Amino acid sequence: MGEWLDQVYCEDTLQGITRLPDQSIDLIIADPPYGLGKDYGNDSDKLEAEAYLAWTQRWVDAVLPKLKPNGSFYIFLTWRYSPEIFVMLKQRMMMVNEIIWDRRVPSMGGSTRRFSSVHDTIGFFAKSKDYHFDLDAVRIPYDAETKKARSRSIFVGAKWLELGYNPKDVWSVSRLHREHRERADHPTQKPLEIIERMVKASCPANGVVLDPFMGSGTTAVAARRCNRHFVGFEMNPDYCRLIEQRLAALETSETA
């Protein structure tokens, strides 16, 4: 393993990605700016549609060679651009799932000319049909009542009742609010529950996860909690310091 392992570089992915050897990454989790004008401390979210899609293609083509032949790729998207980006990605990879993250936010106010948007779109892609996927690691336990009822069914084996069921492609996980303990100072921080599900399912033990847009560092935290390695890039110096703080706090809690 190289010196780049378990590092977050405070630089643009397009500049720093050459640090990584080709076919060295098991899983890529990308949460790029959505092109909606949010403030990330730079101009990364203020591109017009055509420029945004061209930029997306550039960074995708830069990171995909780093993925192993059996590697996987998850990308968070807004509905505004997911159709175009899915088409672009399907020209390069095999699409496994479209996942809907239901952020469990109340539908109040907003536009009176369209339905309220309360979800993010997640694309799950793989480099080949032999992609790594550990379903047992992310099964959801049945509750006692369901387990009792299904134990009488000839269609459900005892093993599957104990292991739990396959998560569906709609993930209802609350977005992070100020009262959540894991909340950090970042406008689009993703819940650990979601990132850890991706890591456990799609990265083998001791494998490597790449995050091209580290943000608050949730991917690094999830990888460490799941006994995987990580590497990533983040342009904002304030967020780089935040990532250091979160990883240090995790290390302290593990040794306490």
Predicted regions: what they are:
Residues 1-241:
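Core catalytic lobe of class I
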Residues 1-4, 244-256:
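Short, conserved SAM-binding/catalytic segment
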